[in-house]
Amino acid sequence: QLDKTISANPHYASAHINRAMLQRMRIESSLQEGQNIFSAPSQEIEDLFHDLSRAIHLSLPASSPTAPVSEYAARMLRTAYSHRAYLYLKAVETETQLKGLGKSELEELASKDFASAARYGDEVAREMSVRTNPYAKMCGAIVRNALREEQKGEAARG
């Protein structure tokens, strides 16, 4: 049914998002033990990403990606970006390479998509953007190591 709607209204972003969500739910409900969403045929996964990317493209302002958008477009953008970021994180979680991208590249894509969703009003995505940001993780690791070394030094002196 959604295929017909999209064929008749190819510029309707919401239909692309709905089809992607339904497709993901259908895939996840049919998984066997030990499988993950990326166990589905690659064409189905590509279709998911295509629908989400198309919804983003249709919802962004033509003049500039940073131009103001309507409330409807903001809702479409935050939903599509969050959904795509979720898929990138699932790929990281399941150690799946997408289009030859490894864990760090996928985490970076997820972080960027979460940041984009946050820009359009998704507060959970804002938090996830910070959590998945590879640079923030690296800085956090450096600070933790420095604190650990400082504590070792104090313990040795004390």
Predicted ranges, named:
Residues D3-I6, I56-S64, P68-E71, A118, ...:
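A conserved position within tetratricopeptide repeats
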Residues A8-A13, R26, S59, V69, ...:
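Short helix-capping/linker turns of helical repeat alpha-solenoids
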Residues Y12, H16-R19, L48, S70, ...:
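Residues that mark the junctions of alpha-helical repeat units in TPR/alpha-solenoid scaffolds
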Residues I17-N18, A67-P68, R75-S82, E108, ...:
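Alpha-solenoid helical repeat scaffolds
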Residues A20, M25-Q35, A85, K90-L101, ...:
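Short coil/turn linking the two alpha-helices of tandem helical-hairpin repeats
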Residues Q43-I56, G102-R126, V130-P134, G140-E150:
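TPR/TPR-like (Sel1-like) alpha-helical repeat modules
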